Amino acid sequence: MSNRPNNNPGGSLRRSQRNTAGAQPQDDSIGGRSCSSSSAVIVPQPEDPDRANTSERQKTGQVPKKDNSRGVKRSASPDYNRTNSPSSAKKPKALQHTESPSETNKPHSKSKKRHLDQEQQLKSAQSPSTSKAHTRKSGATGGSRSQKRKRTESSCVKSGSGSESTGAEERSAKPTKLASKSATSAKAGCSTITDSSSAASTSSSSSAVASASSTVPPGARVKQGKDQNKARRSRSASSPSPRRSSREKEQSKTGGSSKFDWAARFSPKVSLPKTKLSLPGSSKSETSKPGPSGLQAKLASLRKSTKKRSESPPAELPSLRRSTRQKTTGSCASTSRRGSGLGKRGAAEARRQEKMADPESNQEAVNSSAARTDEAPQGAAGAVGMTTSGESESDDSEMGRLQALLEARGLPPHLFGPLGPRMSQLFHRTIGSGASSKAQQLLQGLQASDESQQLQAVIEMCQLLVMGNEETLGGFPVKSVVPALITLLQMEHNFDIMNHACRALTYMMEALPRSSAVVVDAIPVFLEKLQVIQCIDVAEQALTALEMLSRRHSKAILQAGGLADCLLYLEFFSINAQRNALAIAANCCQSITPDEFHFVADSLPLLTQRLTHQDKKSVESTCLCFARLVDNFQHEENLLQQVASKDLLTNVQQLLVVTPPILSSGMFIMVVRMFSLMCSNCPTLAVQLMKQNIAETLHFLLCGASNGSCQEQIDLVPRSPQELYELTSLICELMPCLPKEGIFAVDTMLKKGNAQNTDGAIWQWRDDRGLWHPYNRIDSRIIEQINEDTGTARAIQRKPNPLANSNTSGYSESKKDDARAQLMKEDPELAKSFIKTLFGVLYEVYSSSAGPAVRHKCLRAILRIIYFADAELLKDVLKNHAVSSHIASMLSSQDLKIVVGALQMAEILMQKLPDIFSVYFRREGVMHQVKHLAESESLLTSPPKACTNGSGSMGSTTSVSSGTATAATHAAADLGSPSLQHSRDDSLDLSPQGRLSDVLKRKRLPKRGPRRPKYSPPRDDDKVDNQAKSPTTTQSPKSSFLASLNPKTWGRLSTQSNSNNIEPARTAGGSGLARAASKDTISNNREKIKGWIKEQAHKFVERYFSSENMDGSNPALNVLQRLCAATEQLNLQVDGGAECLVEIRSIVSESDVSSFEIQHSGFVKQLLLYLTSKSEKDAVSREIRLKRFLHVFFSSPLPGEEPIGRVEPVGNAPLLALVHKMNNCLSQMEQFPVKVHDFPSGNGTGGSFSLNRGSQALKFFNTHQLKCQLQRHPDCANVKQWKGGPVKIDPLALVQAIERYLVVRGYGRVREDDEDSDDDGSDEEIDESLAAQFLNSGNVRHRLQFYIGEHLLPYNMTVYQAVRQFSIQAEDERESTDDESNPLGRAGIWTKTHTIWYKPVREDEESNKDCVGGKRGRAQTAPTKTSPRNAKKHDELWHDGVCPSVSNPLEVYLIPTPPENITFEDPSLDVILLLRVLHAISRYWYYLYDNAMCKEIIPTSEFINSKLTAKANRQLQDPLVIMTGNIPTWLTELGKTCPFFFPFDTRQMLFYVTAFDRDRAMQRLLDTNPEINQSDSQDSRVAPRLDRKKRTVNREELLKQAESVMQDLGSSRAMLEIQYENEVGTGLGPTLEFYALVSQELQRADLGLWRGEEVTLSNPKGSQEGTKYIQNLQGLFALPFGRTAKPAHIAKVKMKFRFLGKLMAKAIMDFRLVDLPLGLPFYKWMLRQETSLTSHDLFDIDPVVARSVYHLEDIVRQKKRLEQDKSQTKESLQYALETLTMNGCSVEDLGLDFTLPGFPNIELKKGGKDIPVTIHNLEEYLRLVIFWALNEGVSRQFDSFRDGFESVFPLSHLQYFYPEELDQLLCGSKADTWDAKTLMECCRPDHGYTHDSRAVKFLFEILSSFDNEQQRLFLQFVTGSPRLPVGGFRSLNPPLTIVRKTFESTENPDDFLPSVMTCVNYLKLPDYSSIEIMREKLLIAAREGQQSFHLS
């Protein structure tokens, strides 16, 4: 089971959208780079200045504005295709077909149709042989793709099957290929850099390239720069009479004809340059309806862009109503002047044609590859080549036309010589393919009169279709075959024929997705089969067909009454058919309107009951059904009540709490969102939920099963930000809405721009499917334009706005009484229990989440609760929470929303509980902050530098601008925070329709200051400005995309708060705040809100705190005064004794001193100095001060009073209290920014309910490239100069990809002479040997270095990061925008050309850089550690017995200033430093005493800061941050300098993200958060492209072969996979077992590596029998060598240690576990802490020796005491020393000599065998024993070990961990017993078992009784590794799955053993009859089933 990543088509198709300028589509996908889809495809741009000019201009969209034709008057947006990118082009091929048009309502008259038909004939008469090219694969996948192609207008000739269109193309396609791809990307088809080398190249990339996938492209088209514009203008001038068909008109308008009359176009009378050519055989969509629908298509195309589709029906169908609107995200209406045929109409046409492609012709548009969309057919024209015409008469004329076409463009005719025959051959081969003639024969068979003949034909038709695809079925006559099959389907008497006919239709839709438009006609017949079931097979097959149809044509099914029919006999069907039926139901509910409710009403009870079903897929479809209904009816209160009437709420509530959960994360989010929507729009449902005890449910979902009162410690269960967001939204909606007057009036401004007035009514227009859409300005203009052009009229209607009555503020208070408020009054008990249950939880969620979206929601919910709770209840609820300090920190936030909320909360609390809070607000600093706000002049405009990008201390990293910029951008639906408006009080900031599901689809805020003119005429822009709140507004695609990515548009509000006011112009372009709504609105709103804050703060102070004059008499100040006094005593110049420390201890541990008081007393800084200062002036030495501190806070002895025995102080409570207080201070003060892209996930009901978090942005990276100019560095002349012009580079490519690109083209060769003769012609000459080298090794010697400016770029940095960090142009942006405000950097990054210099690597530098981890100079690190020391020391040690003193690790930490590796600034820095010192003291205090017990005072876990952890986790879950390598510096620096702030798993993730390449980091992220991957990783770059190398090893020589594998692949970046000789198993299991077995082999006694005792294995297998292994209960440590050991033996042992280093590093790198029980001192060596090893560490190696050493050390201490005793005479001293004994023996009598205990041949110094140990040299002896055992004797082994390790990646990356944690990192979790509850939560029963199955319960019971050895056996059997990863079963990936092993009825399960699939952790368990038999069989299998992988 090889886990090889598939070459997923999605990944590859992606590139076609890459062309930044649209001028060079580089579709690697479509193959041109056949031999090497490389990881670096760089695109040089044209050299010819003229050509370059035009293409450049076109790229930037500055086409000379000659054409003012109305049709294309809109802005020229260059990157239409970009925005469109995530559309079909991106889908894996399989998916591309699932979209097909919905032709259900066809409101057009027959006469029109006839008219069109005639015209069609007329046209075909004119062009008798339109091209037969059938586009099928990605060549034009999706309308969007063809549009893009067209728009690029490159001279792109699509040849028949494209493989070698013209010489020129061939040549130009070549530079884009790179033989030396990294295998990784090769496999994944991921080209990272793209070539746009010349005009030809630009075309070829999109055309010639088509070959590899043998697309038959859509014909040929030619780019004619300006001339086209003229032509277009002239054509539109001669605008045809209105009588002409819309189609023709469109053509004349846009020049894109779909039935291209070639002869006429090219007759001599036509001046060629003027032509605007379209793809030749464009489809005849004449049969489709006239113009009107084009509008729909047009809008659709405009909005298409980010519409994500995926295959599974639920995830796929964004609702129809939505679809029309949400597409707005795409490019703006004003598509582009350059849009050639696609300007106004093209997009529409594209869509229309795809839809209608040639329905009538026998050749069938089916094969045209544009992915169908659900838009209505037909629309304003503008051709896109969905080719197909009947069998074309003359292929020669095809060729002739093609040739004429190319020559017209200026291609030399002589190129046609060699190509001609090939071309026609290709034409013939594909188009005249056998398939269509075979289909014609079968068609006759289907129409025969003889049933047996019909049956035979239909069976063969099935075979033809099931084996076919769009390529092989070119010209399949769908139009004729479908009616024939429908006829057969009605032969009620012949089940066989019906069944096969039904199958054929299903297969046809699979193979030719476009055929579904025709198959729609079969819906009534399919439904008949379900209404009266005569043959169950036919009925089930009909369901399958309907399910496929429902993905595109759900409306047709719904209106035919199909929903009820499908569910009619649901229970009779097999489970798969049931799933299909429910999927159909879900799809039918997708865009249902209130008028269609009656179609579903009767099925609701059945669906409701279905929620209790066990089948996961059924339940999910049912949930999807309800979620879509609620979404679509959200403003129809009566319908919502009907939907929720039959037990729906109860069933869903039960569904949410089922353990283990049935719902996936995405579904869970959707269901909770559905509840929120119901509650906000229908308060009676909220009341019903409250009565059903929803509070307990929510508490359970957030905190897990509660034991005891909820007031106690609240531990949240881990949930994704989306889940938290939805749950808090629901809590918020269950409470009544806040009023909208008084202090809440300001919310209106926070909610939306005041410019947005919600009218009482909205106007809507009807599209061709009869769906109504609200008007907005942009739509209106397009509609008007199209209606005019097509002579169409459209129905419009006026509809009361559901939102209007809730007033502009978006609250629903103006409605009649809120039922929730009634409930609060009528049932206070219920309200009370609700509030008590959830307040603490909400509070905890607020404190622990870092994403602004969640925090804003929480804040709303808390405000509602506080507002509606009465005083008594409040007192009760609040007593356990430090509300005041939270309010204080919220008031210092940079986010206006948070500040406003905090002021409102303070006001409510002071009104309700004045006596309590008047004291707390003073002590906790609330009053201080409020006064600050009241007095501040420039309120919040320029926060102090330190926190510019900081967050409010509640961690809201959002910042001021957020509140208002968003305030204004109301309906961009973001509200600056995804308050994904579905609640009334913070909601309804949706569009007039307020549909949740559209929200994300329209996240387009036009923004762009300085560059605006390029994209759109200013006047347009200004018009749009006021309209920016209109949800559907979009502006130039690129700008809007950037805007949408600006995290402000999600919940990460921009942090450069001030920029808005200070530099409007710059902000406009950069941070994306301006242009979001008219600037005035923004600044007005900001100013208004600031004004409100200031005024409110002022009133607050007046009202509550003006009475006292605060002369210090206030009791609230007592603690502060005491603390200040004590702090002053901590004076270093005067010895204040320990009294001040005692006072501080009592303040900290007994009083409730607040963080505010600690901050303001100066205590932190003073204590830090007291503990660390080491200056001459100090009155008392630092050591004494530290001991005093320990005495006071830890009751250790005072200086000078140490006892002789062990120092074992007890009582760490005061120190613990101090640490907690400091941590609280840190949480309140820190303002670390979090860069997250945190909008709540997708359209709740549109299907792709995925975690959309960074995927939008990732798509952006996939579709945009950086423009770089490669230049030889001025310092060097001995490499070639790059002459290829600027190149386009994938932003996520690594710098080494550029190196590879250049080196394999010969730019890495250093030349002696300076001939500059060779130019970039050499691109062709790729050096194959170099390419292969790059391909096969992870470790090629670097040849070139790269610089941006003066900065040397690390090879493993992404180009994007390099440009962003070092590019000079980036500097000037740094001030106004940083990652925090815009993760994609400023637009400038994407438009400027960045210069990257290259020069050869100097010889002397090479040696340092050879390592994968990109480490530099490792060569020095290891040896320097020992060698210089050794040189001098060896003599002293050997001759004189002098060993280096033990270093005190505490020294390093005792510094009052930040260490040099902390570079960030933050207000909390002093607190961090103090905590660092306190942690060091707690950890290493015993180094201050000779004889202290070696244990921590406070466990490290007590230092963890939950707020920083929440921020870190949030940061590390963001795919975009990881893909761009954009981890904030504070996180990596704190992780290494203060690891104690974060728990182990957070640091482990941080380690993987920073230590390795991006793909590994992503892999790790996906392993830990599988839901990120749910939707769209396959076609975006989220999916990591990890290369895998497979090796086969022989079990008999495992160690030897493992060494050679590590030698070859140890330092390779590929993942290593192992297979065993003569065994079939491959993949994860054998690989894990390999590491475990090699670990075991390394413990063999005969290798002589370890200290310990020899044992044999208890369960030996094969060669293990009779082998002795070393065991050491304390953990393994290297066996020491003496000075006299044999060099050969030493060399062998060093080799093994070097190998061990590589093995361990590789295991860490590949997420594998080793099974080596290493001792703690081993890990200290790994972390370079060997110099601080002491006698304490001997305990972890050899406890027996360690105990003796301890006793002897006591004797040494007594001896010192005696010697210091002044009263002793010489004689009495001598006597006293002789009486010192150990166990009654004097030292001399112990008979020790100077050799290492246990190793008589290792002398501790020269001649040590002959030196006896006496009382006088005892101290020297003990020092030498410790030094030799832990350092000297083992240093050579460890140096080799570290060398081996560092050849894979640098050891310095392990600084995130403490030595005792490395065991977890390397070997997984510690053994502990397994409990049945955990097993139940973490293991998945499947395929025949559920959690209630007897066998599963038996299994859990057996597993929970296993001892350690049995656990290891079981794990090794099931997973391949005897240890679980950290986190135990929870972290096992994939999870342990228990499936039922099936048998024949004659066989008895008790006779069989269980078997496993280790790759996916499947345990195949027979259903044994008793638990005893199961235990016995399991143990036999586990023991015997080791070490072999055969098929079970």
Swiss-Prot record:
Official protein name in the record: E3 ubiquitin-protein ligase TRIP12
SMART domains, sorted: HECTc (SM00119)
Residues recorded with modification N-acetylserine: S2
EC code: 2.3.2.26
Domain WWE, chain residue ranges per copy: 749-836
Biased composition regions of type Polar residues, renumbered to the chain: 1-10, 18-27, 78-88, 119-132, 280-290, 326-338, 360-371, 803-812, 1041-1062
CDD domains recorded: HECTc (cd00078)
EC main group: transferase
Matches recorded under InterPro entries: ARM-like, ARM-type_fold, HECT_dom, Hect_E3_ubiquitin_ligase, HECTD1/TRIP12-like, WWE_dom, WWE_dom_sf
Illness the protein is tied to: Clark-Baraitser syndrome: An autosomal dominant disease characterized by intellectual disability, delayed psychomotor development, behavioral abnormalities, variable dysmorphic facial features, tall stature, obesity, and macrocephaly.
Any single GO BP term: regulation of embryonic development
Region (Disordered): 1-398, 797-817, 938-1080, 1407-1433, 1568-1587
Gene it is expressed from: TRIP12
Modified residues (Phosphoserine): 12, 77, 85, 100, 310, 312, 942, 991, 997, 1016, 1030, 1317, 1322, 1329, 1376, 1427
Domain of life: Eukaryota
Subunit: Interacts with MYC; leading to disrupt interaction with isoform p19ARF/ARF of CDKN2A. Interacts with TRADD; leading to disrupt interaction with isoform p19ARF/ARF of CDKN2A. Interacts with SMARCC1; leading to disrupt interaction with SMARCE1.
Keyword Metal-binding set for record: no
High-level lineage: Eukaryota, Metazoa, Chordata, Craniata, Vertebrata
Family note: Belongs to the UPL family. K-HECT subfamily.
GO CC term, one of those recorded: nuclear speck
Biased composition regions of type Basic residues, renumbered to the chain: 1001-1014
